[in-house]
């Protein structure tokens, strides 16, 4: 075949034109510039003896083109003719039908039944024919439809064969435009013939299935078939090949996107759009190049095909690209008139397409997810998935705590999943931690993205919340949906999620696979934030101490003898867990606690106790009745995890005579090697098997105190109308009250002398988001306080807002409301803010302002307003007229062994600076505005500022550390919640989820037993049994004495800020010192944080070992009752004394 072709690069069109002249005209040359131009006596059409081809070189391109044109226009004519005849037939039948119908109506009565049968038979035949045609049409539609497997296979096959036909065209484009070919010997022609037979059959199916034949005939795919299929059959008939319009097969590339969608390869809108643009651009490019290749190699017909030029197909592709891009180098250009005319129009359309399509294609390619792909798990290394609110602030805070150097076992890779790509700052943060952090773009609501991050093999999934969002309920709903999606994909995954609102935690209980016993946790920021603030009402500064305990802080050493030195030494302490050595088995908790503190330099505050049925409970300072079991888990306060190992390695035989705790390391005793707990990591808790700890702090084996037995005098003396508890026995409870009964007017509040109470100043209106005041009230109404020890709570704020909160507060006793504003000094004076134990400033309008620096403006203004107020000497007036103000423990009838015996009365407060205040802040940097006399830099971290160190400011951001702490040890969260919520349990949460309110219960032995749990207290050293240690004594001696004598566990000091100065100072501010060392020197003005046991005898006498919440200048306690009531030596005479009061005060007292 190749031998019959005279020259591969010769232009056939120019040569055929030359062959019509005489053979002797060899001197005349073609207009072609080809250097391989043949002599004019050569035959242009290759001739072989086997193929009957026209030896005269006659061109037959018109035959190929005519076959296509006849097919197209002939079919178009038939379709139009059919439609015309059908229309005329329909019109005629319509008119004839009316005539026949009229005749049928007129002659219907005279016609016999038999005359109608031929008509019925004809209608049945027509119906049968219509049914057959419809069936064939439906069958053809199914065959070409991509909705069935057969249709999809057929569609894909047609596309693949079209690409194959295009490839054959590329191969044949290197041959002359028209040449003689033997069908039986040309392999490419045979393949092309087979392809086109298949295309013809597929065309028939499409034609049958088409509803509108005319539009089908004019479709792009149909036009492609018209100009590519008939010429192949003409080639076989004429033994001649014409390259012609076969380049139109490139238009099939437009369907490439549809084919990929049929194969389920393209799923996203961006990928579909990208493939669409690319396929349209490439198909147009290749088709136009094919046309230029045809006309340039053929020449113009009116020029007798003499102005042709030899261009390969790929040179034409190059020409079209430089033309579309408007570059036009000029090395290749069109010479024929047809080619130039085509280029004129193509430049207009091609330039528009190039200018619009190419930038969009580049943008789609450039915007492809940089953080796509999938996570590849590393053998021997766990990974966690972090999702939710992913920002620079939230991620940096999380990583700073999670990857803290004090954690010695962080072999965990952190995988962040978020649907928005990180900004440059966040991307830089990820790069700085690239060895332990990876980021993937996606959504946890998409199962495909969950599979990408290997959620099924993840150790846990942590969901962060946006604490500063405008709609907390919507944010909680988003996180709940994330939990549902993750649990639906993998029910066994452990999830730790942040929640903003307490009432939204109930929705998590509706998720079937949510199981807190298996490690699932919901960290409710509102619950913990208000719980911390409530504990500061009982012991000022406690919120700061607890916040520092579960936050990882590095030790900052200060040489100067300043208050920051002692504060930062305590800040470096954190909460850890470790299994106790078998050397402690059988010893009581106080004995082990003293041994750990004195010898191991560790402070143990709680243990995990397993009852006979293997149920685990966390017991905080359980007392001397409980003995340590084998494999007991202890909760320690220490500076790092390595120190806590001493409790596990301690051996009495090997370490009894060691004085340096750093030398206590693992010894070679066989007893330690065989110890079962040694196989457990201190960070792996009950998730390795067994039941997770219940947050209850009361053990099942309760001490058998006769005061807890029903029928005892204690129960008989209980006033059933006052001393009631909820159904769990964890909180004081009363019958629901209408809000009108607890509302005080300003005059009523002023006439009712309040003292030792808690004033809650709240900013909120009818449209503000609820902050959940129940979480503030519940710790103040814990049942481990006796009723007379409960501090009265007075809310000052908008009545519209408080009405929305009242449904959750109406079951708590001693709650009053003063409608007004915390910025009104008259309202503040009416509630005797100078006599309160604590003033709490909250805001429900924090997140509705775009400027973060203005989010706390109301709280800051209220705080400064109170501090600038001046008061008279109200204390002296009260003491002169009423003995009822005597605080608990100050009564001279108190037993001599009371640790608070002989304390001084509260000094008079004449300035608002001395009022104990705790202010909630949203923006940490706003803490600089609370104290005007401090020197805090605006860039100083919150925990280093004076207001936070003094316990007068609290921000929700400090709770971010709980995510990391809970992951490494979920018992830490249980311990924190037990301390700050007053005893909230999952059972209580389930009950609140059902009724949204506490349910009253009878005082049964089981519920009364729940009262026997320790509580946080604050003791003064100025007087009492510890007074001898207050002046220069050691903290370690105080620790041991309190533990042995009263089972009280000391864990910190609340010291005056200027106590270290040699000269007296008028400053009344105090700061927190956490877990001071044994030899730490005490001063008389110190207040000691301690965990105090429940006093069963305090309910019958005002003299009790009770807590106190001191003001910044106070070293004594206040009563938490209405102090206009005269008291007697016996508490039981109080109702009688009330009857002797005037009627107005009695009514006001009943309202309270």
From Swiss-Prot:
Transmembrane segments: 61-81, 153-173, 189-209, 214-234, 239-259, 275-295, 342-362
This protein's encoding gene: KCNMA1
Name of the protein: Calcium-activated potassium channel subunit alpha-1
Regulation: Ethanol and carbon monoxide-bound heme increase channel activation. Heme inhibits channel activation.
Record organism: Sus scrofa
Segment S10 as annotated region, ranges: 948-968
Membrane topology of this protein: Multi-pass membrane protein
Lipid anchor positions (S-palmitoyl cysteine): 92-93, 95
Composition bias type Basic and acidic residues, residue spans: 1136-1152
Described purpose of this protein according to its UniProt entry: Potassium channel activated by both membrane depolarization or increase in cytosolic Ca(2+) that mediates export of K(+). It is also activated by the concentration of cytosolic Mg(2+). Its activation dampens the excitatory events that elevate the cytosolic Ca(2+) concentration and/or depolarize the cell membrane. It therefore contributes to repolarization of the membrane potential.
Other known facts: The protein was initially thought to contain two functionally distinct parts: The core channel (from the N-terminus to the S9 segment) that mediates the channel activity, and the cytoplasmic tail (from the S9 segment to the C-terminus) that mediates the calcium sensing. The situation is however more complex, since the core channel contains binding sites for Ca(2+) and Mg(2+).
Annotated positions binding Mg(2+): 413, 436, 438
Gene3D superfamilies referenced in this protein's UniProt entry, alphabetically: 1.10.287.70, NAD(P)-binding Rossmann-like Domain
Location of the motif Selectivity for potassium: 326-329
In-chain residues carrying the UniProt-annotated modification Phosphothreonine: 679, 886
Similarity annotation: Belongs to the potassium channel family. Calcium-activated (TC 1.A.1.3) subfamily. KCa1.1/KCNMA1 sub-subfamily.
Motif (Calcium bowl): 919-941
Record-linked Pfam families: BK_channel_a (PF03493), Ion_trans (PF00520), Slo-like_RCK (PF22614), Slowpoke_C (PF21014)
Annotated binding of Ca(2+), by residue: 928, 931, 934, 936
Domain of life of the native organism: Eukaryota
PANTHER family: CALCIUM-ACTIVATED POTASSIUM CHANNEL ALPHA CHAIN, CALCIUM-ACTIVATED POTASSIUM CHANNEL SUBUNIT ALPHA-1
Composition skew (Low complexity), residue ranges: 15-34, 1102-1127
A GO CC annotation given for this chain: monoatomic ion channel complex
């Amino acid at each position: 075949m190749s031998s019959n072709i005279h020259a591969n690069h010769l232009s056939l069109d120019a040569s055929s034109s030359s062959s019509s002249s005489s053979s002797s005209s060899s001197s005349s040359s073609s207009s072609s510039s080809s250097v391989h131009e043949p002599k004019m006596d050569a035959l242009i059409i290759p001739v072989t003896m086997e193929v009957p081809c026209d030896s005269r070189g006659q061109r037959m391109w018109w035959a190929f083109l005519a076959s296509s044109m006849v097919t197209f226009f002939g079919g178009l004519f038939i379709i139009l003719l059919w439609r015309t005849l059908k229309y005329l037939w329909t019109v005629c039948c319509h008119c004839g039908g009316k005539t026949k119908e009229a005749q049928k109506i007129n002659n219907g009565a005279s016609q016999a039944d038999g005359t109608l049968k031929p008509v019925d038979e004809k209608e049945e035949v027509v119906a049968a024919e219509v049914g057959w045609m419809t069936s064939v049409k439906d069958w053809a539609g199914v065959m070409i439809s991509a909705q069935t497997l057969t249709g999809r296979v057929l569609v894909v096959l047609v596309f693949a064969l079209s690409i194959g036909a295009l490839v054959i065209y590329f191969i044949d484009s290197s041959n002359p435009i028209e040449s003689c070919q033997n069908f039986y010997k040309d392999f490419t022609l045979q393949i092309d013939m087979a392809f086109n037979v298949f295309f013809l059959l597929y065309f028939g199916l499409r034609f049958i299935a088409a509803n509108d034949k005319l539009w089908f005939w004019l479709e792009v795919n149909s036009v492609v078939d018209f100009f590519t299929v008939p010429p192949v059959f003409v080639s076989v008939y004429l033994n001649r090949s014409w390259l012609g319009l076969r380049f139109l097969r490139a238009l099939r590339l437009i369907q490439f996107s549809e084919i990929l969608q049929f194969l389920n390869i393209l799923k996203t809108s961006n990928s579909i759009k990208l493939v669409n643009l690319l396929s349209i651009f490439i198909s147009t490019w290749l088709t136009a190049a094919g046309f230029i290749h045809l006309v340039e190699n053929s020449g113009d017909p009116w020029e007798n095909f003499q102005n042709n030029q030899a261009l390969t197909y790929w040179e034409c592709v190059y020409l079209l690209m430089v033309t579309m891009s408007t570059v036009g180098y000029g090395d290749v250009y069109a010479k024929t008139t047809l080619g130039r005319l085509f280029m004129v129009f193509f430049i207009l359309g091609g330039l528009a397409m190039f200018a619009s399509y190419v930038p969009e294609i580049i943008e789609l390619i450039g915007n492809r997810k940089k953080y796509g792909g999938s996570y590849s798990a590393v053998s021997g290394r766990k990974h966690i998935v972090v999702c939710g609110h992913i920002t620079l602030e939230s991620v940096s805070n999380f990583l700073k705590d999670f990857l803290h150097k004090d954690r010695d076992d962080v072999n965990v890779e952190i995988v962040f999943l978020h649907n928005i790509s990180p900004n440059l700052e966040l991307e830089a943060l990820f790069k700085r931690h690239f060895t332990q952090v990876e980021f993937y773009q996606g959504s946890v609501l998409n199962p495909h993205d969950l599979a990408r991050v290997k959620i099924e093999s993840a150790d846990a999934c942590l969901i962060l919340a946006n604490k500063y969002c405008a709609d907390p309920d919507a944010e909680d709903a988003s996180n709940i949906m994330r939990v549902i999606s993750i649990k639906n994909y993998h029910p066994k995954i452990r999830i730790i999620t942040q929640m903003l609102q307490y009432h939204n935690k109930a929705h998590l209980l509706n998720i079937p696979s949510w199981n807190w016993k298996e490690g699932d946790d919901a960290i409710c920021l509102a619950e913990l934030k208000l719980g911390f603030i409530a504990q500061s009402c009982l012991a000022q500064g406690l919120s700061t101490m607890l916040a520092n305990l579960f936050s990882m802080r590095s030790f900052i050493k200060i040489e100067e003898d300043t208050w920051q030195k002692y504060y930062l030494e305590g800040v470096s302490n954190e909460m850890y867990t470790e299994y106790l050595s078998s050397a402690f088995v059988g010893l009581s908790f106080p004995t082990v606690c003293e041994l750990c503190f004195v010898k191991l330099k560790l402070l143990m505050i709680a243990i995990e106790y397993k009852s006979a049925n293997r149920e685990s409970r966390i017991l905080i300072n359980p007392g001397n009745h409980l003995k340590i079991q084998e494999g007991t888990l202890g909760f320690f306060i220490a500076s790092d995890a390595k120190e806590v190992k001493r409790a596990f390695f301690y051996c009495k035989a090997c370490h009894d005579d060691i004085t340096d705790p750093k030398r206590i390391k693992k010894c070679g005793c066989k007893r330690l090697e065989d110890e079962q707990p040694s196989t457990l990591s201190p960070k792996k808790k009950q998730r390795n098997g067994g039941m997770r700890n219940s947050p209850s702090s009361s053990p099942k084996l309760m001490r058998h105190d006769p005061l807890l037995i029903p029928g005892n005098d204690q129960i008989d003396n209980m006033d059933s109308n006052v001393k009631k508890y909820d159904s769990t026995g964890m909180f004081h409870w009363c019958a629901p009250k209408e809000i009108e009964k607890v509302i005080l007017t300003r005059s009523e509040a002023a006439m009712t002398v309040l003292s030792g109470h808690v004033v809650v100043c709240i900013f909120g209106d009818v449209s503000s988001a609820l902050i959940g005041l129940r979480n503030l009230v519940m710790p103040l109404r814990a049942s481990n306080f006796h009723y007379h020890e409960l501090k009265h709570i007075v809310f000052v704020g908008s009545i519209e807002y408080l009405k929305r909160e009242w449904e959750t507060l109406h079951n708590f006793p001693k709650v009053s409301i003063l409608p007004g504003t915390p910025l009104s000094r008259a309202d503040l004076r009416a509630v005797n803010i100078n006599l309160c134990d604590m003033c709490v400033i909250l805001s429900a309008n924090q997140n509705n302002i775009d400027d973060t620096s203005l989010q706390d403006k109301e709280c800051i203004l209220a705080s400064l307003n109170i501090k600038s107020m001046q008061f008279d000497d109200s204390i002296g007036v009260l003491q002169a007229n009423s003995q009822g103000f005597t605080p608990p423990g100050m009564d001279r009838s108190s037993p001599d062994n009371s640790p608070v015996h002989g304390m001084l009365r509260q000094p008079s407060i004449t300035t608002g600076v001395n009022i104990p205040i705790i202010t909630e802040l949203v923006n940490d940097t706003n803490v600089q505005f609370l104290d005007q006399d401090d020197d805090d830099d605006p860039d100083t971290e919150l925990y280093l500022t004076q207001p936070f160190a003094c316990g007068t400011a609290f921000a929700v951001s400090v709770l971010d550390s709980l995510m990391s702490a809970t992951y490494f040890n979920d018992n830490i969260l249980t311990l924190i919640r037990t301390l700050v919520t007053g005893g909230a349990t999952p059972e209580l949460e389930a009950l609140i989820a059902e009724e949204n309110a506490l349910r009253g219960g009878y005082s049964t032995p089981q519920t009364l037993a729940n009262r026997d749990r320790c509580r946080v207290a604050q003791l003064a050293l100025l007087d009492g049994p510890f007074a001898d240690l207050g002046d220069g004594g050691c903290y370690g001696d105080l620790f041991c004495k309190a533990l042995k004598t009263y089972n009280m566990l000391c864990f910190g000091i609340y010291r005056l800020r200027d106590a270290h100065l040699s000269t007296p100072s008028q400053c009344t501010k105090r700061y927190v010192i956490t877990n001071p060392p044994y030899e730490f020197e005490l001063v008389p003005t110190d207040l000691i944080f301690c965990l105090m046991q429940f006093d069963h005898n305090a309910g019958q006498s005002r003299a009790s070992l009770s807590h106190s919440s001191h003001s910044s200048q106070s070293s004594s306690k206040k009563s938490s009752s209405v102090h206009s009531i005269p008291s007697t030596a016996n508490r039981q005479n109080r109702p009688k004394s009330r009857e002797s009061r005037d009627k107005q005060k009695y009514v006001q007292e009943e309202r309270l």
